[in-house]
Amino acid sequence: MWDYTDKVLELFYDPKNQGVIEENGEPGVKVATGEVGSIACGDALRLHIKVEVESDKIVDSRFQTFGCTSAIASSSALTEMIKGLTLDEALKVSNKDIADYLGGLPEAKMHCSVMGQEALEAAIYNYRGIPLAAHDEDDEGALVCTCFGVSENKVRRIVIENDLTDAEQVTNYIKAGGGCGSCLAKIDDIIKDVKENKAATNLNNKGGSKPTNIPNSGQKRPLTNVQKIALIQKVLDEEVRPVLIADGGDVELYDVDGDIVKVVLQGACGSCSSSTATLKIAIESRLRDRINPSLVVEAV
């Protein structure tokens, strides 16, 4: 039995704004509809919006849905949330906002709030006469989940927007991986890639300290091992360690053997599943950039 909030149960037993908005020629307003999901897959939502043309405001909204308790409650909540908003304001409503309005949803039911957000986007784009294919970048790229027709771009977007960390969460949000399960490994790879890209971005943004000033006498002679170790330690202390420490980790220089730099990852970095990304992106790339492009970093 799912643990639903009182608000979810209230809108399930007594849903607001259920039904259709017909286009009846009323002056100054226009009706548009957005549809997502599939009855064959177990969830479908049709969202209707009535828009005051002059102000671009949503004056009424109704829904029709085929789905569970969470689907009905999420759809009902959405129709209440968007009334009085301009179309641009409504486009900012996220699936998280819908879930928050309901006081939370079981994670296995988060896909219902995602459907609401997508139906709203579809309705607004239909109102504006923009073909859905023109804005739906989620449908581009390789298909990851053939059971539910979910592309790599959509998986990637949902992972980034909701800070998801495993394939089970992705299944809960957009159903990908919930059929035969053959795509779960691919979903894990996408999550890992998102984490690595985020780590690289954080390093660049937080690499807070100014670039280490590496002396350059203009001489062509290679660095001695003592000089190399001193420079590596300087870069680690001034540019790498502050970033890692801020995230609960750290790194210690263990040894330098030619171009092989051996380090010990500590704290969160030592137990993190993305430790390889930390080595290659956060440490190795920085040392190569500052000292020598042939340096290779290894953990011991």
Curated annotation (Swiss-Prot):
List the residue ranges of the region (Disordered): 201-220
Q: Which GO terms describe its molecular function?
A: 2 iron, 2 sulfur cluster binding; iron ion binding
- Cofactor(s) essential for the protein: [2Fe-2S] cluster
Q: How is the cofactor bound?
A: Binds 1 [2Fe-2S] cluster per subunit.
The source organism is: Nostoc sp. (strain PCC 7120 / SAG 25.82 / UTEX 2576)
One GO term under biological process is: iron-sulfur cluster assembly
Q: Which residues bind [2Fe-2S] cluster?
A: 145, 147, 180, 183
Q: Function, please? A: May be involved in the formation or repair of [Fe-S] clusters present in iron-sulfur proteins.
The name this protein carries in UniProt is Nitrogen fixation protein NifU
Instruction: Give the protein family.
Output: Belongs to the NifU family.
Q: What gene name is listed for this protein? A: nifU
Alphabetized NCBIfam families for the sequence: NifU_proper
Which InterPro entries did the record assign?
BFD-like_2Fe2S-bd_dom, BFD-like_2Fe2S-bd_dom_sf, FSCA_dom_sf, N_fixation_NifU, NIF_FeS_clus_asmbl_NifU, NIF_FeS_clus_asmbl_NifU_C, NIF_FeS_clus_asmbl_NifU_N
Question: Which UniProt keywords are present, listed alphabetically?
Answer: 2Fe-2S, Iron, Iron-sulfur, Metal-binding, Nitrogen fixation
UniProt superkingdom: Bacteria
